[in-house]
Amino acid sequence: SRDDVSIHANYHANDPSQGWAMSRVSDQMTAAQKRHSDPADTANYVEHYNAVVGVNADFYNMTTGAPSGALVMEGVEYHSGASANFFAILKDGTAMIGSSSDYAAYKDQIQEAVGGSVYLVKDGKSVVTSAADYYNSRHSRTCVGITAEGKVVLMVLDGRQEPFSAGGSAEELAQIMLDAGCVTAINLDGGGSTTFVAKQEGSNTLTVVNRPSDGYERSVSSSLMVVSTAPVSTEFDHAL
C-alpha cells in the first residue's frame, strides 16, 4: 500500500447531493478532478490530486440512476448498503467486502463504499452458486477483489464482441480473481456498463481503455476511482 494512492467511490458530478442521475465514468472522474484541484476551494482542494483510473461499479435503476446498494463518499452515506453486498474503504484505510447483513456493523467506519451483487470469492475459494443465466453465460464483467495482503484488485473483462472478446461467466471471473491472489471478491455491474478509464503512461488525458460492448461509453450510476496524490515528475512509475 502507498500513502499517496487511494480508492474512492464516485458518482455523477462527484456530488450525489444534487440528486440521482447517470453519467459516464470519464465524466465522473473529470468532475472529481475539477472539484479537488482548485486551491481557492479550501474545503475540497487536495494538493497533487490526480484521478488516474476508474471503473463502473453498482447496478442501478436505469431510469433514475439510483444505485441498487451502498453509496458512501467521503464518509457521507447517500444510499444504504443494507440490501446488497458491498465494497468499502474504511476510515483507517482498510479495504473490505461485506454482505448486506454486515453493513450496519460497519456503517460508522466506512469512508467510501459501493454496492455489488454476488460474491465471486470468499475465504479464498470460489463461491459462485447462482443458477441465473446472466451469471452462467459469458458477458462483459466488472468486479473488485481484495488479496490476503489487503491490496485491491479491479478487474474488467470485455465481452459480447466475438471474435474480439467473448467475456466470461461468473465462475470464470471468480477463477481469474483467485489467480490474481484475491481471497474475497464481488461482482459489479457488467454488460454494456463495463467501463475501464485511465490516464495512460505519459498522458494526462482520460481515455476509455476497454472496448464497451455498446460501442460507446455508457452513462452509469456509481463508479470506483483510483486517485494519486504523488507529485508529478518526469519519471515513470508502475503499479505492480
Pin down the residues of each PLM region.
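A short, polar/proline- and glycine-enriched secondary-structure boundary/capping micro-motif
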Residues: 17-25, 106-111, 163-170
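Zymogen propeptides
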Residues: 1-86, 96
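Short, solvent-exposed aromatic-acidic interface loops
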Residues: 10-18, 100-105, 157-162
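Active-site-adjacent helix-turn-beta-strand microarchitecture at beta-sheet edges
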Residues: 55-134
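Conserved, well-ordered active-site substructure
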Residues: 64-82, 89, 129-183, 193-237
